[in-house]
Amino acid sequence: MSDMDDEITRIFKVRRTVLQMLRDRGYTIEESDLNLKREEFVQRFCKTMNKVNKEALFVSANKGPNPADKIYVFYPEGPKVGVPVIKKEVAIKMRDDKVHRGIVVVPMAITAPARMAVSELNKMLTIEVFEEAELVTNITEHKLVNKYYVLDDQAKKKLLNTYTVQDTQLPRILVTDPLARYYGLKRGQVVKIRRSDATSLDYYTYRFAV
């Protein structure tokens, strides 16, 4: 298999994981997209010189009936993504379209100035950056990984009232945890985790994102 074939296969797997991640966050993703075969991926996204057209990989997805609750996924070209891409290609499009959440998938770590730009932009937007290597496989598909459910504000309030606790009294999970990143956890949110004991009975625990 050639290097180009390897790259196509890698990006095919990355795209599949991204779509699964969006689905697991509650966004509407077509089954036909989730189940796209590699051959179909090549026909759809590799029309020039057997190379993936990353611009065509762009995703726009909605969560539930609210059209304002939308997310964009960007796949910038080039091995190293810097400030111009983050500010001009990502942030400007999100602002123009009034989309407040976005994911940027990059081949390798973004530059230090780009990280600073993302941090600054995240005061107004939510921009997540994933490296392709993090998405080649879906970490939630491992049989030992527990199922996560991110509580909305109403469910969180009900939980805290039921147990008469403050959210800060719950066990914590870092927003940098790989599973927290997969589910897009923000600081202050609560996640419900389904676990199984030795008898295969399910039980639930809760974590407060910090």
From Swiss-Prot:
Broad class of where this protein is predominantly found: nucleus
GO biological process: DNA-templated transcription
Location within or outside the cell: Nucleus
PANTHER family: DNA-DIRECTED RNA POLYMERASE SUBUNIT 5-LIKE PROTEIN 1, DNA-DIRECTED RNA POLYMERASES I, II, AND III SUBUNIT RPABC1
UniProt keywords, alphabetically: Nucleus
Gene Ontology MF annotations: DNA binding; DNA-directed RNA polymerase activity
Family named by the database record: Belongs to the archaeal Rpo5/eukaryotic RPB5 RNA polymerase subunit family.
Any one GO cellular component localisation term in the record: nucleus
Record-linked InterPro entries: Arch_Rpo5/euc_Rpb5 (IPR014381), RNA_pol_Rpb5_N (IPR005571), RNA_pol_Rpb5_N_sf (IPR036710), RNA_pol_subH/Rpb5_C (IPR000783), RPB5-like_sf (IPR035913)
Identification of the protein by name: DNA-directed RNA polymerase subunit 5-like protein 1
Organism the protein comes from: Arabidopsis thaliana
Presence of the UniProt keyword Manganese in the record: no
